[in-house]
Amino acid sequence: MHSVVCIKQLPDSAQIRVHPVTNTIMRQGVPAIINPYDLFALEEALRLKDKFGGTVTVVTMGPPMAEAALRKCLSFGADDAILVSDRAFAGSDTLATSYALSAVIRKIMEDMPVDLIFTGKQTIDGDTAQVGPGIAKRLDYQLLTYVSRIVDVDTAKKEIQVERRAEGGVQLLETSLPCLITMLEGTNEMRFGDLDDLFRAARHELKVWDRVAAGIDTVEMIGLKGSPTVVSKVFAPKPRSKRAELIESHDSDPKNLAEAALAKLFTQHPNLEQEIAKRAV
């Protein structure tokens, strides 16, 4: 079984700041991390490898510094890693990114069939959840989104069964391979790399593919030229000036305090009392 895991290296969103004058993201000094949902995807691919054998290949599109993210994935147990890096990819939106990654996976399939493609459900910087489905569409793969757990894989029948988190419950889905899975935070925690994998990751000769090596003949479908979506502005929300209002009382009875708070609320929102009365009937 051959699984390809698409990951993204991005700035740690917990430490990102927006410049107060230019409204641009200040990346200086912000550490880079692997998109957390992509790590859940990697863990599921590695667990399938542990159970059924096979190969796990990790792919990322980004600048040369993304090599560190790939080596980290190798240290967890991935077998191979490909960095797709070219100035022509700069400014790619989700449409251009899915085009580029699907081309890379097609190139990989020239040497070895790909049974499963894993991505995180979305990245924490863009939150679009579009790249995974875009890859599946371009490769004509079955698509399973928002998967929380892989229940079973029948390698003989080439079928997979998963749990998909949906509003109000969990769906049990089954489809044929090959397919693409976008992973939620699952029931399995990310493993720690053992010493052998840590040393192997440090020595591993990464594949670095430019546009031509990835099999992309034209620049019209990648980068800014292939991106109909453009971010026009990034800004931090203005802080609200409103403050919480304190209701002072010397009455220690909780019921009386609650009634005082409700009276204040009904004064500010006259229709609210009527609405509550209707629902209580």
UniProtKB/Swiss-Prot annotation:
Record SUPFAM superfamilies: Adenine nucleotide alpha hydrolases-like
Subunit structure: FixA and FixB form a heterodimer.
Family per record: Belongs to the ETF beta-subunit/FixA family.
Function recorded in the entry: May play a role in a redox process involved in nitrogen fixation.
Keyword Transport belongs to the record: yes
Domain of life: Bacteria
Swiss-Prot/TrEMBL GO biological process terms: nitrogen fixation
Endpoints of the signal sequence: none
Native organism: Azotobacter vinelandii
Statement: the UniProt record of this protein carries the keyword Transport: yes
PANTHER family xref list: ELECTRON TRANSFER FLAVOPROTEIN BETA-SUBUNIT, PROTEIN FIXA
PROSITE patterns the UniProt entry points to: ETF_BETA
Name of the protein this chain belongs to: Protein FixA
Keywords assigned: Electron transport, Nitrogen fixation, Transport
Alphabetized SMART domains for the sequence: ETF (SM00893)
An annotated Gene Ontology molecular function: electron transfer activity
